[in-house]
């Protein structure tokens, strides 16, 4: 059995599922992440919701993990996922991460953007009509800071 490589913290913040991703990730990590993500997103199924993905360190996906993340993201769109904001400020591999995630999200009918700060992500998503719980965002950021 292979072990998960990579870590994450997932928090629901209003209409957003916020993920702090520490990479690189392998497919076992993506599988574990998908289970945790689904648990947090289930209350949003049937209405439109969004993601904020904050990446830290070598935020890379090995090829089979990239494919699996694409499949998992595609499965969320019919359930209501419509927008993804990726926060790159703490990534040490920004260009590669951006290229990988563009491939991952391309053609999935999910609008996505890349920003530097979580505040920029919140602003972009609020501008698209999402209700982002700022208190939950603060708690998520505090949880990340204490890791």
Give the predicted meaning of each segment.
Residues 1-147:
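Amphipathic, Lys/Arg-enriched alpha-helical "gate/interface" segment within cytosolic domains
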């Amino acid at each position: 059995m292979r072990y998960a490589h990579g870590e994450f913290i997932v928090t629901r913040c209003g209409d957003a599922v916020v993920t702090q991703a520490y990479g690189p990730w392998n497919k076992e990590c993506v599988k574990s992440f998908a289970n945790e993500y689904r648990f947090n997103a289930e209350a949003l199924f049937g209405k439109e919701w969004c993601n904020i993905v904050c990446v830290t360190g070598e935020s890379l996906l090995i090829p089979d993990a990239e494919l699996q993340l694409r499949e998992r993201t595609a499965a969320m769109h019919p359930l209501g996922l419509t927008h993804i904001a990726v926060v790159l400020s703490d990534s040490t591999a920004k260009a590669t991460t951006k290229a990988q995630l563009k491939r991952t999200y391309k053609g999935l009918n999910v609008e996505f953007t890349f920003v530097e700060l979580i505040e920029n992500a919140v602003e972009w998503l609020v501008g698209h009509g999402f209700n982002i719980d700022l208190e939950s965002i603060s708690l998520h950021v505090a949880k990340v800071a204490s890791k």
